[in-house]
């Protein structure tokens, strides 16, 4: 190769090397600047995630949600030791409507006229449920029957309640030998004393007044639990109650289905209980007859229409 050709080749080769260095270095600078560019975070700190809105979106109650449940309490086999209460859980209104039903309510079922207690005594919970459906015109979805022990378990969970005892309550139970001696005035009632007040047979207002006492105590008990253990330990309460000697057709599936609605209500109010006292009069047979105005208003109170 001539000197001139070698010089040209060297010059050409050097030009290529310099070009590669310049281009590669520039490219590296451009790419490095892009890769290491600090993102613009302005405005991110101003974004607030509404956890409450996200939680509410998990369950949104609609009108008509809820169940109607008949509660029966039988401390022993006698009329004044038995209580009935119809409850409607209405999550759309954040409430549980409680209607105490006195044992001497008149009803005609299958051509037989009798009282609620007698239908229950003769036919058990299924007959009591049918009788309540007949004189209220409502469908009872489920029932819960408490014994003395299961009621004490439930009441212990819910907590003591304060109640104004109207009179001195003095009674010696001839069947059990148990004594009741409770002074009038404001009292803090535990589960055992609560039961005695509910089952006291000698109120001056008779069975009609005793039913009102049961309703007021039930409302106080529910609200007490809603401020405490129901809000904090709902699963534990259900498990322990359902595993007691309670009689019910409520299943675990029912509970799991209703749990979001219950939690929704408990998160929105600490006093969901709303008491509705029945109205009526005694008929010629000495049975309490619910008046039509009360019966017609029940669906509205129960948030069903």
PLM-predicted stretches and their roles:
Residues 2-94, 199, 262:
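Entry/capping segment at the start of metal-dependent catalytic domains
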Residues 51-57, 68-73, 77-78, 93, ...:
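C-terminal solvent-exposed extensions
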Residues 64-66, 79-84, 93-101, 127, ...:
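Extracytoplasmic
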Residues 75, 114-122, 135-142, 199-209, ...:
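Second-shell loop/turn segments in exported
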Residues 97-123, 167-180:
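Flexible, solvent-exposed short loops/turns enriched in glycine
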Residues 122-181:
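Amphipathic, coiled-coil-like alpha-helical scaffolding segments used for oligomerization/assembly
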